[in-house]
């Protein structure tokens, strides 16, 4: 939790979106977020329309669902993560994002961490990462996220608790400083 509070801006609400390329862990993360007191709501019609436009252009796979968590499938690429994350960061119904780029072969290349970090620059909404397990690749992903200032967790439950801490801190700031997170 401390890393999240140290490196990320507070979430100005408790509505979280989860972006992954592995459906099962995304659902586990959604459950963990809800159990922690966060909301994993449906996306707005505007956001869904943007995602559908990406599908129509061939920028997203047709099998990707528009539900939250968003599952790019095992075929998701670094570019897809970046484009969808940008849409989520712009969405008014999303206060923070949890990204879970699992290192599946072949489309998830080493540049997925950089692509996500570069996309997040300029946004004030918090982003956390999760790559489950203790494999060398998972540990490498988490280390690289941390180098970019994006706290990365080994379990969805830890990531959810950290995001909840950001939402609670944001709520505290809004109560005590109504103009926002000054």
Give, region by region, the residue ranges found by the protein language model.
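Short, small-residue-enriched loops and turns at beta-alpha junctions
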Residues: 104-108, 134-136
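Amphipathic, non-transmembrane alpha-helical secondary structure
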Residues: 79-90, 110-118, 161
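Short, flexible coil/linker elements and helix-boundary hinge sites characteristic
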Residues: 58, 66, 109-110, 174-177
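Peripheral docking tails and interdomain loops at the edges
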Residues: 1-20, 24, 29-40, 114-182
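Short glycine-cluster motifs
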Residues: 12-102
